[in-house]
């Protein structure tokens, strides 16, 4: 009977300590960013590649025949391209590792469908605006949509010229 009581006390103590931990609130991941550009595939493809180059995005793979461009991972301040959520009511600040994959496919002869997928996680973060940057734990982040919107606005402007 003594060992059951001890086990219960240990369990209650462990649950009590776990309840004191900070709650991590993850941002909801948005769906992939999709749009259509009113220009042919070749013109749009050239505009996408030129725009990514102008924005100095490191590229890992370009496959024109399949319409895929994959960026390499690069560092971005949290809350510019990546929303990394909150811990205990404090917004995460610091740096995030982000990467994007752009898919393009012809839509008839005068249009191109584009989809941008994103993948993001914290690299060095802190709770709130002060404190030491930490590398662990790593939190998954969601796109703010800013990179995608800026990219496609620049592509649309480029194909109009």
What do these predicted regions represent?
Residues 1-10:
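Bacterial N-terminal signal peptides that target proteins for export
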Residues 21-161:
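Ser/Thr-rich, low-complexity intrinsically disordered terminal regions
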